[in-house]
């Protein structure tokens, strides 16, 4: 099939018509945001010229501090100042407390098993904390670029599982960001160095941050990166260098090992400054609490050499897992601020027998790679630089109740690809389901392109929501779409095949994407209204069935009260205010709670009738 250009309508070299996009490196210790301006990728700084934003959030009763200010408050308010939240994404409360037993946070006991943290601002989860960090970065980008962002690419570790990736996406959504794509951090670093358009082969990304070490082995084939193996150490980073040096200073200065939190903080701060100084100098002076001394780079390297060797053990394991020899590695990319330490670069270079890539600031390289990808995905590249891929040009999905579109495969997904989702029945006793396959970016079916329809029959009669139908979308290398629907308990199945691109010109694709962008706010409002109307219909149908069966459990006054609320709900459904419908549903739910309780009591009594205690 022909290659499809990832391009957006209205793209032009004119700066005032460029779409605004950003790449975000959501890190464990620090986060960054970058963009492409005048053809050059650059990290964006805050008003004080700082590029790094500490991944720290402090929650107060009427205020939320993010970044440097939050970090300064960490000592005074540790319980409400949350850091390293990335470690908690997609993990259960039990998992987190067993891995990190000394966390100062007040966790909220809950049946869900999720790590919910109690703060003066309310209960927050890791997704919300991540969202607050993303929001701060987005605000920095908006201020720097002078307009709202059309989309972002957010990076994640290559080893992140689906729950962690979905958590990252949800955090971006809560921050009000449109995620163009999640990009693996090592892939972003490789893109920053232009390796995606270079020679095919194996690339190693060595990422030594403040708190963690990650190693990734990638294979580049025809412009596509495949992750062959990942590894690392979640308890090893530049902070450990600081601790080794702080202990050295403590011993030399004769401070002893008393439990002095303030002194330990001072020692770590001095150690960090000294480490940075030794990256450019052979000797560094130390002055703390009246003690003066100096340390040579050679002495410092002797301290940290065992830690660097530990990283190389992880490298060896990852190469073994990938079944790759050291001699097969084409390039080694250095990521993370701790790779500035000369000994790290030297030992990594010696291990791979080649000079690692270090010309891009290792703190910024991931965000820069993400910004390059984001710029491509919103269509800012001129034709001569267009990324060519076999991709799905428009999202593929199906119609759900209320004329809504559920996107199954988003646009710009590389093919071949297969995705599946589960759906259920809307009505009691439903034995068939009509599957309407659509194409487009709008929220309502009426605004999208209809591709095919088929019907799944033979669904066992069940209560609404009881049946589980798995719908699978599969696009092969030739762009042929196969859609199948299967009822899981019986295995009954139906399917259809269609060519989504047939009869669709580039101009029509561009117009459909342009239309989705121009109508985004109205579409979301229409979707919310439709969703509330569907929920109202479900609630009313359920109540009607309940009243037909058990109306005798209500007094006349209670029936009248319920009828009045039902009338309010029906009236709101005829309107265009989703909030009014939502409030009416809540009011009806409150009005019928006692009725529901009586029905439950009656059902239990009927089930127990005629049975002795022993039988039960």
Swiss-Prot record:
InterPro entries: ATPase_NBD, Heat_shock_70_CS, HscA_NBD, HSP70_C_sf, HSP70_peptide-bd_sf, Hsp_70_fam, ISC_FeS_clus_asmbl_HscA. The lineage of its organism: Bacteria, Pseudomonadati, Pseudomonadota, Gammaproteobacteria, Enterobacterales. Gene3D superfamilies: 1.20.1270.10, 3.30.420.40, Actin, Chain A, domain 4, Substrate Binding Domain Of DNAk, Chain A, domain 1. One of its GO terms (molecular function) is unfolded protein binding. It holds the Pfam family HSP70. It comes from the Bacteria. GO terms for biological process: iron-sulfur cluster assembly. Keywords: ATP-binding, Chaperone, Nucleotide-binding. Belongs to the heat shock protein 70 family. This is Chaperone protein HscA. Chaperone involved in the maturation of iron-sulfur cluster-containing proteins. Has a low intrinsic ATPase activity which is markedly stimulated by HscB. Involved in the maturation of IscU.
